[in-house]
Regions:
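C-terminal regulatory/effector modules of DNA-binding transcriptional regulators
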Residues: 75-234
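Long amphipathic alpha-helical segments
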Residues: 1-101
Length: 234
């Protein structure tokens, strides 16, 4: 899962002792095999409710997604269980986003996953962090065709478009996609990419003047600059 491991390193330190989150994660994972829906939901809901969401996001939700993905990869849980956990994590992030005020001013940011990419937890996390900082966010989610992305950017004229790449593409597919982004999206918006795949394809992105974000700390720095620029134009 893209950016998830890096997110923990770049996130603010949580106020709870790390062992508390580690113990909770072990308890949550223990409910997945054998699968116990009631205990899983009670523990997850209870934990997220009692800490600030930023701490819950980086101390519980992102590590949980990362570890569940690894369990599925190692054939310790079924893909249906992995999807179940992922949907709960998505719901938590969407719920937190919906409690934030709708920005009428500030930098405009489009967040999406490229064509064929269905894993959107990291992209959703990016959208949340943009919302927290007062950006006007257009979150498009998974598997967005380049033509559709370009069409939207042409209409809303964003200050920045961020794409989430969890995995590197083959050389041919990467070249085709990056050229399409440069030709169709870049004329309407500055482009940035993040994730393990983006970092692996760094040279190709740099060749086409597309910014590669190393982690969430670098994202936050870029967003702060955008918001200052937006304020100065107001």
């Amino acid at each position: 899962e893209e950016l998830l491991g890096r997110a923990r390193a770049s996130a603010p330190r949580v106020s709870f002792v790390d062992n508390t989150f580690s113990r909770l994660l072990r308890e949550l994972l223990s409910t997945l095999n054998p699968f116990n829906r009631v205990i899983f939901e009670k523990r997850l809901n209870g934990a997220v409710a009692i800490v600030p969401f930023e701490e819950a996001l980086h101390g519980i939700l992102l590590p949980l997604q990362e570890q569940v993905g690894q369990l599925w990869h190692d054939n310790h849980i079924d893909v249906a269980v992995e999807h179940y956990v992922t949907k709960h994590i998505q719901q938590k992030i969407f719920s937190a986003m919906n409690q934030l005020p709708v920005a009428e001013f500030g930098a405009k940011v489009v967040v999406a996953c490229p064509p064929g990419e269905e894993h959107d937890i990291a992209a959703l996390t990016v959208a949340y962090r943009c919302r927290v900082r007062g950006c006007r966010v257009y979150y498009l989610g998974a598997n967005v065709p380049v033509a559709s992305l370009a069409n939207l950017c042409g209409k809303v004229e964003p200050d920045l478009t961020i794409l989430s790449f969890p995995l590197a593409l083959s050389d041919d597919k990467a070249t085709e996609l990056v050229q399409a982004l440069a030709n169709e999206v870049s004329p309407a918006s500055n482009l940035a990419v993040g994730g393990h795949g983006a970092i692996a394809m760094r040279d190709l992105f740099v060749k086409y003047n597309i910014t590669v974000l190393e982690d969430f700390a670098e994202l936050d720095h870029k967003l702060d600059r955008l918001m200052r620029q937006s304020s100065s134009r107001a």
